[in-house]
Amino acid sequence: MVKDGIVLGKRYAVLSKIGAGGMADVYKGRDQMLNRYVAIKVLKKQYKEDENFVRKFRSEAQAAAGLMHPNIVNVYDVGEDRGLNYMVMELVEGITLKEYIERKGRLSHKETISIAIQMCSGIGAAHASGIIHRDIKPQNIIISKDGKVKVTDFGIAKAVTSNTVSTNAMGSVHYTSPEQARGGFSDQRSDI
């Protein structure tokens, strides 16, 4: 765990832990150069020696960094400092779609359509840039306090090329597409 107050890359002050995923912890931070709050995703220590995890982590940053869209969480920076691999992203104050559904229960048709349109807009922008997400699930969708829906966590995203064939099953077991589960060819349709 990263200590509060540590400064990464001589720029990003870690303020407090705000979340955790399978391979990284997420902290609220402050960009001291631009004087704004950010989210700092730090690769868990048990994975820092694993080249595959480090590559996967950097791949997320590279895949998402080129995507500038109101329905995608922006990635600002990626780096390594004191043995910590980190990614700096837009801080979205809100909750995941999973948490939102758990709190609200059944959503109205109007609300469901609004969320779906915003998700599709973000995913469509990624596809237009040649990126497939490969892990779309409620935990990777954030709803901000003002109702803006944003796609996040491009951890297993991949550039769409003729080599976008995987022999490994990727994605979350409950949400993965059949072709991904079989280790087959993944393309934009896998996100739908």
Describe each model-derived feature in a short phrase.
Residues V78:
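Activation-segment/catalytic-loop signature of the eukaryotic protein kinase fold
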Residues M119-I131:
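Protein kinase catalytic-loop region centered on the HRD/HxD motif
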Residues L15-G21, V26:
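Protein kinase glycine-rich loop
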Residues R82-T96, Y100:
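Conserved short submotifs of the Hanks-type protein kinase catalytic core
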Residues K44-G66:
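AlphaC helix of the eukaryotic protein kinase fold
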